Amino acid sequence: MQLRRSNQYTFESKVRYSETDLERKLTLPAIINYFQDASTFQSEGFGLGIEYCAEHKKAWFLSSWQIVVERYPELGEVIDISTWPTGFKGMFGDRNFILEDKEGDILAWANSLWIYMDLEKGRPTKPSEEVIDAYGQSAPLDKEFAPRKIDVPSEFTVMEPVQVRKYQIDTNGHMNNCQYVAVAMEVLEDNERFTQFRVEYKKSAVYGDILIPKIAKEEDRTIVVLCDEEDKEFAVVEFR
């Protein structure tokens, strides 16, 4: 059972059929969506959500995250999803997430790094004291956090290209964070189930962009790099 933090946001849900896989377990993209929803709900509750960002021409962009799944919840299981900011430094903000069962056991957790962007100037900027004070800061999870950058192998197998579809675009006009992982998972073998994931976002894909997945398998991990047609990276996804 986790102690509730002063700036923690929590909402309850039930695992839906539309969120499950062949084994009736919650999928990784669904876990990611729950975590994203939690941070969005908290921002909206603070008055710092989509409308605030549009008015002030600011936005939080996800730079990287590490997700660890202890157990995939099953169809119909009641779950709690929580998030809280853990610190701010310059243009960066750190945020933790947990997904718990009704007994308070952690089923999945994540550590993430976000960049605050000035959309008018097209560059990172430091969030105002108003924003920092509203979010607050609490201690991070007592977990071993992986570094932000993912080591990329030199040799890959190039897979079939994928075009970004309309349904993959979010309110920022970019491909949603979850969709990069969903595309990367398509090149994995069907019987593979991983419990640790890292994603490093390099640049945003937009509607119509071509993503070329490149996969490399090592002894203890699988790396999928999503590149454009000039071999520039959109995202690096690591599965363990």
Task: Give names to the regions the model predicted.
Residues 63, 93, 195:
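Exposed loop/turn and edge beta-strand positions of beta-sandwich/beta-sheet ligand-binding modules
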Residues 156, 162-238:
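Acidic/His-leaning functional-site neighborhoods
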Residues 2, 6-11, 66-70, 74-150, ...:
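HotDog/MaoC-like acyl-thioester-processing domains
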